[in-house]
Regions:
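Short, conserved micro-motifs enriched in small and acidic residues
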Residues: 14-18, 202-213, 358-362
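N-terminal capping segment at the start of a domain
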Residues: 1-18, 30, 196-200, 270-273, ...
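Short beta-strand element of the alpha/beta-hydrolase
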Residues: 117-122
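A non-catalytic alpha/beta surface segment that caps or lines the substrate-entry region
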Residues: 7-112, 131-170, 176-179
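Active-site-adjacent substrate-binding region
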Residues: 38, 271-380
């Protein structure tokens, strides 16, 4: 993990490519063959969201100056484009933006002709920081009693689309106050996105070096004791931090050959906080509940292993598991949290290997292996 965190690896970058090559080499040391699948990706989220927020603010200003139809149409189009940019949407706004290359690492173990497949997912890129991720913010929310009252994380990114929405509503209804609020929120959101874009990349030990080393541990165990009737794909995607572009590309390439009835996706995301958990649901704008059968499997295995799971948490963001769940696959996400129901050191400079709870990482590996072994014995 310390080797990986020393690689500066923003989404769709040369550093991400080096991280992918490093991971392929580590798989090879274990005796597992892995390959890199290069895919087109934009590599940010702050540009499409920032542009959308700016267009929404411009639409609001046009409306306030008497051009309500044009302003409302511009703000509405910006809102629709921004909404599509959140996973698992079609990412319409970024299609007009420059594209780079992202690098997915794929390692296949077990019988190649197996009828059933488990895909274990990590990601090897790392995030930009930003003031919106300041660790003091959850502490303030906790002092205000906001953390205890809810089991769903705050929608950090959803308000960004709120500016264009309010500007459009104000334009079409003639309510100038709504329009003014939309303009202010749009300008503020654009500024926040610009600030994130100017920040450097965090070390990314918990998010998501913990999952990468978990894949390596799983590879070692599966080589030592191969599954009998199950193909296992150990997948580390790039560009997760630019709204799961690597996972979306994997889906476009591989979902047509992975049948929904015989494929299980197991996403590992930031498993180095004090408390292990299995997400109940997630989504930036729309909360999507994870499949009941997948959750029952994970909860039952955790009980058998005597692994305590932090109960009933949902997140108003998106892991790579959101893509496979939205595509109709049985999916589960193993993650972790602090007492404040947040990933430890999330998108901050303290996200170092020295601050990772390796006991939680080990429990996540145990639960992941148990899931694979159980599905090898019998399917859902």
């Amino acid at each position: 993990m310390e080797e990986l965190e020393r690689i500066e690896r923003p989404s769709a970058s040369e550093g991400e490519r080096r991280a992918a090559e490093w991971l392929v080499g580590r798989f090879a040391e274990l005796g597992a063959e892995a390959r890199i699948e290069a895919e087109p990706a934009h590599g940010t989220y702050w540009w499409p969201l920032g542009i959308g927020a700016t267009l929404g603010a411009i639409g609001g200003i046009l409306s306030l100056r008497g051009r309500r139809v044009l302003g409302g149409a511009l703000a509405g189009a910006a809102a629709a484009g921004m909404a599509s940019d959140y996973p698992p949407g079609k990412r319409l706004l970024r299609r007009a933006l420059p594209r780079r290359t992202t690098y997915n690492v794929v390692c296949e173990l077990g019988p190649a002709t197996a009828e059933r497949t488990v895909v274990a997912i990590a990601h090897h890129d790392a995030a930009h920081s930003g003031l919106v991720f300041h660790p003091k913010l959850p502490e303030i929310a906790d002092r205000l009693g906001m953390i205890e009252r809810t089991d769903t994380s705050p929608p950090l990114m959803a308000p960004v689309v709120g500016g264009p929405v309010l500007a459009a509503l104000g334009a079409f209804t003639g309510r100038r106050l709504l329009t003014k609020l939309g303009v202010v929120l749009g300008i503020g959101s654009a500024a926040a996105m610009a600030e994130i874009g100017m920040r450097e990349v965090v070390p990314g030990a918990n998010d998501n070096g913990t999952a990468v080393v978990s894949l390596l541990a799983l590879a070692e165990q599966l080589i030592e004791q191969p599954p009998e009737s199950l193909r296992v794909i150990l997948l580390s995607v790039g560009s997760e931090e630019s709204f799961s572009e690597g996972m979306k590309a994997f889906g476009e390439r591989h979902f047509p050959t992975l049948t929904r009835e015989s494929t299980f996706f197991l996403c590992l995301e930031s498993t180095g906080s004090p408390h292990l958990l299995v997400l109940r649901g997630e989504g930036f704008l729309k909360m999507r509940e994870y499949p009941a059968r997948a959750l029952a499997l994970m909860d039952g295995l955790a009980e058998e292993l005597d692994v305590w799971l932090y109960p009933n948490l949902r997140t108003r963001s998106g892991t790579d598991g959101l893509e496979s769940m939205a595509a109709g696959y049985e999916t589960a996400v193993i993650a972790s949290c602090t007492d404040l129901k947040q990933p430890a050191n999330y998108h901050w400079w303290h996200d170092l290997a020295e601050n990772v709870d390796f006991g939680t990482v080990a429990d996540g590996i145990r639960l992941s292996e148990a899931t694979i072994r159980r599905l090898d014995e019998r399917w859902l």
